[in-house]
Amino acid sequence: MSATSTIVMPGERIAAIEELAKSKRVILGPGLRRLDDTVVASKAGPLRHKEPGTFWVDNYQRRYIPARGDLILGIVRAKAGDLYRVDIGATDTASISYLAFEAASKKNRPDLIPGDLIYARVLNASADIEPELVCVNSVGKSGKLGVLTDGFFFKCSLNLGRMLLRENCPVLAALTRELPYEIAVGVNGRIWLKAHSLKETVALANAISALEQSGCAEIDKICGNLGDFLQA
């Protein structure tokens, strides 16, 4: 993943992406919009790029706006026929079919109840329809997606969520050197965390939350504080 030095403004045309789209598949993320054959920015901020062809604008926002391909954490709110209504922190609730889980069928439905936490991917998202979620990849396997049990759930800023999801994130690598854990991060500003004990889980959650104020530059200090806390 790379960050360009280009700052874009709403309505600005992004010619570089248009040119790239002529020779390869390009995916537009939050902050970018396709208008006929042109690509324009819909938000202000640094233009970001992830190989091979994903672009988005890293704009600070308080409310999550769903985009196709996003990894999110959702809370099941209700069942409606063959669908489950899921709170993903957006303006509208999302939906997920019982068939959107690995090995699901009419006779083998997932047993979800209100309050369950799921790690899912946004399949469809537009202004005209409610977001649709899936808990499987393109070959029908769940991977890390699905229902999350036990652990500790907390919220963070959308920017921190995106930072933690970057490939080779130095924060998660540094924390892994301190102790083993499981984590699921959503770009909708939600995190699920599970370590061997409650004390370790809370310590990790506090360390990650501290990044809201200090940033990656203080990760060594944060990890040091984590070690001191665990030894106390």
UniProtKB/Swiss-Prot annotation:
InterPro entries noted in UniProt: Exosome_RNA_bind1/RRP40/RRP4, KH_dom_type_1, KH_dom_type_1_sf, NA-bd_OB-fold, RRP40_KH-I, Rrp40_N_euk, Rrp40_S1
Disruption phenotype: RNAi-mediated knockdown in the whole body, neurons, glia or muscles is lethal. RNAi-mediated knockdown in mushroom bodies affects the morphology of the alpha- and beta-lobes as well as ellipsoid bodies. RNAi-mediated knockdown in the wing pouch results in severe wing development phenotypes and increase of miR-252-5p expression.
SUPFAM superfamilies recorded: Eukaryotic type KH-domain (KH-domain type I), Nucleic acid-binding proteins, Ribosomal L27 protein-like
An annotated GO cellular component: exosome (RNase complex)
Biological process terms in GO annotation: brain development; CUT catabolic process; exonucleolytic trimming to generate mature 3'-end of 5.8S rRNA from tricistronic rRNA transcript (SSU-rRNA, 5.8S rRNA, LSU-rRNA); larval lymph gland hemopoiesis; mushroom body development; nuclear polyadenylation-dependent rRNA catabolic process; nuclear-transcribed mRNA catabolic process; poly(A)-dependent snoRNA 3'-end processing
Major place of residence: cytoplasm
MF annotations from Gene Ontology: RNA binding
Name of a matching Pfam family: KH_6
UniProt entry keywords in alphabetical sequence: Cytoplasm, Exosome, Nucleus, RNA-binding, rRNA processing
Gene3D superfamilies on file: 2.40.50.100, K Homology domain, type 1, Nucleic acid-binding proteins
Compartments where located: Cytoplasm; Nucleus, Nucleolus; Nucleus
Function: Non-catalytic component of the RNA exosome complex which has 3'->5' exoribonuclease activity and participates in a multitude of cellular RNA processing and degradation events. In the nucleus, the RNA exosome complex is involved in proper maturation of stable RNA species such as rRNA, snRNA and snoRNA, in the elimination of RNA processing by-products and non-coding 'pervasive' transcripts such as antisense RNA species, and of mRNAs with processing defects, thereby limiting or excluding their export to the cytoplasm.
Family as reported in the entry's similarity comment: Belongs to the RRP40 family.
Self-association and partners: Component of the RNA exosome complex. Specifically part of the catalytically inactive RNA exosome core complex.
Name of the protein in its database record: Exosome complex component RRP40
Organism: Drosophila melanogaster (Fruit fly)
Lineage, highest ranks first: Eukaryota, Metazoa, Ecdysozoa, Arthropoda, Hexapoda
Gene for this chain: Rrp40
